[in-house]
């Protein structure tokens, strides 16, 4: 939403997670992923919840490994870089979730920004969606300690 001076304002809705992975703020998503100001706040919240659930399923084995080793929260992991007290694992988690949420919201973004969309809008939107989902998958692979690609001998 825009204020009278054209300054964007972001919602301050905290989305509660499962206790291991960090809670996320919908306003952080709006700011970091440059969502259109006309986008419905509740729709953004729902997309983030869906992305959280999707990432949590993919990260279940990693979470179980941490719990088995006495680490009860992603915030308690002490390896890796930190920014303002937030560790690399939590930052990666947030980035993976936000990439998936934005991929989910892309069709809505297109209708907010381009009412008379060109004929290639659907293709660009699908390409961007694929890039965002690939970004999320790369981050999750990194969280598991894997590189961008893996070769396995059959």
Range-by-range predicted roles:
Residues 85-154:
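Short loop/turn elements at secondary-structure junctions
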């Amino acid at each position: 939403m825009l204020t009278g001076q054209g300054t964007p304002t972001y919602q301050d809705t905290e989305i509660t997670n499962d206790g291991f992975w960090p809670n996320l703020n919908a306003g952080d998503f709006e700011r970091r992923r440059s969502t259109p100001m006309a986008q419905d706040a509740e729709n953004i919240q729902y997309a983030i919840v869906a992305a959280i659930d999707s990432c949590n399923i993919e990260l279940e084995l990693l979470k179980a490994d941490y719990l088995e080793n006495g680490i009860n929260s992603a915030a308690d992991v002490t390896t890796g870089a930190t920014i303002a007290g937030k560790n690399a694992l939590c930052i990666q988690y947030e980035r993976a979730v936000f990439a998936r949420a934005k991929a989910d919201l892309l069709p809505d973004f297109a209708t907010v920004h381009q009412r008379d969309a060109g004929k290639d809008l659907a293709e660009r939107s699908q390409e961007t969606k694929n890039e965002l989902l690939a970004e999320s998958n790369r981050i999750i692979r990194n969280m598991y300690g894997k590189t961008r690609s893996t070769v396995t001998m059959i």
